Structure formats: structure tokens, C-alpha cells
């Protein structure tokens, strides 16, 4: 059996800028500044806990657990407020999920919290399409560690080598490849030069078909 595992932010949902805006505002309240370019270059691959911890360390600050948890709750609340402004799925997301879901079991492996993902999917009538969702709160190690993809493949009942991951970042690709998946890179957050480790690169989910997935799993990507 073959399967497809999606990243979420930057692949199905146009939420990377919303995550950045929420993080920027949380950090600004602490007197810190983070540009979008720096976020993309250095922090996009982390889950929230890793991102805030590493950023604080770059400022010479070690956060105790209480302070870190407070900042994470603040960022989560700000992100929810940004999300409330409207629909965030890419136009090609639902058709792609329908197309691939008719051929393969689907899962999500993401650095976002599972509840955030499920709320967006439910609001767009897509929650039923995914057999498994692995969020940041489901793993001990975030991307680029392979744990999230390992857990997603296990939940689907497939070996990692029988699955294709769709990712938008170098860290996500590293995570999927480390778990043993074939990979499709999508240029929503980075250009092709940032996705050189992908087995195949697309500019839109419109280009991702069951035939492409089968081709990659046959080793012909």
C-alpha cells in the first residue's frame, strides 16, 4: 500500500505569514525584533517551542519552563486571532486532497499544534480526508528530526519507503528523507534552490497527481 503525507503550513494552508505575525508580536512584547526574512532563513523549520527557545538563546536569554509556556500560549492566542480573519487554505488544496485521497490514504505531519490543524480542516470540510494527523504536540522531537513522519507512516500502517511527503521547506524535506520517504517540494515558501533535496519540485498542488506519486515510489522521479 502507498500513502501520501502532507506538511500543513505552506503546503495545504497559507499560514506561514500568520505564524510569523503571531510570533513577531509575541516577541515584540518582550522587547525583541524578528524580521520575516530572518524567520524564513533560520526559524521556519522549528515548531513553536523550538523556535522561541532558539530565538531567546540567540538573544542571550535562557527561558525557564514557566516563561516559555507563557510565551507559547501568547503566540497560540495571537495566531488564533489572525486565523479568525478568514479562510487560509490554498485554492489548490481541496482538489489535491480529493484527487490523492481517492487513490491513497492520507496523513499530515506538521510542526503546528494538532488542534490548530484540525480546526482549519474542519472549517473547510476536509478533516475526514485524513486518516492521521501528527502535530507538534504529538512528538518529542520536531522537524528536521524524522519523528513526525515516522509516526504518521506508522499511523497509516505503511512503511516510510511506501509514502511520499509534500513539503515546503528544507527542514521538512530533511525530516521526511530522514524517515525514508520520497519527497515533493513545493515552492510556496522557498524557490527551487532551497528545495534541492526534494525528489521532485512543483509550484502548485495542481501539479501533484496520483500518477506522479506512483512514479516517485517506483523510483522514476
Report residues per predicted region:
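Helix N-cap/coil-helix junction residues
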Residues: 32-34, 61, 126, 157-158
Amino acid at each position: 500500500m502507498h500513502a501520501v503525507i502532507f506538511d500543513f503550513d505552506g503546503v495545504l494552508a497559507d499560514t506561514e505569514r500568520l505564524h510569523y505575525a503571531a510570533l513577531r508580536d509575541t516577541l515584540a512584547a518582550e522587547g525583541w525584533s524578528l524580521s520575516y526574512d530572518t524567520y524564513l532563513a533560520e526559524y521556519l523549520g522549528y515548531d513553536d517551542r523550538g523556535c522561541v527557545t532558539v530565538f531567546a538563546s540567540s538573544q542571550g536569554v535562557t527561558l525557564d519552563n514557566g516563561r516559555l509556556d507563557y510565551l507559547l500560549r501568547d503566540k497560540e492566542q495571537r495566531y488564533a486571532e489572525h486565523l479568525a480573519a478568514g479562510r487560509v487554505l490554498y485554492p489548490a488544496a481541496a482538489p489535491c486532497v480529493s484527487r490523492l485521497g481517492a487513490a491513497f490514504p492520507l496523513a499530515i505531519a506538521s510542526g503546528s499544534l494538532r488542534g490548530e490543524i484540525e480546526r482549519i480542516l474542519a472549517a473547510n470540510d476536509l478533516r475526514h480526508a485524513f486518516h492521521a494527523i501528527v502535530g507538534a504536540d504529538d512528538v518529542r522531537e520536531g522537524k528536521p528530526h524524522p519523528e513526525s513522519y515516522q509516526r504518521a507512516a506508522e499511523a497509516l500502517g505503511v512503511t516510510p519507503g511506501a509514502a511520499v511527503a509534500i513539503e515546503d521547506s528544507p527542514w521538512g524535506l530533511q525530516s521526511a528523507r530522514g524517515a525514508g520517504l520520497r519527497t515533493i517540494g513545493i515552492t510556496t515558501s522557498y524557490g527551487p534552490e532551497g528545495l534541492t533535496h526534494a525528489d521532485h519540485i512543483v509550484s502548485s498542488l495542481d501539479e501533484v497527481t496520483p500518477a506522479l506519486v506512483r512514479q516517485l515510489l517506483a523510483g522514476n522521479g
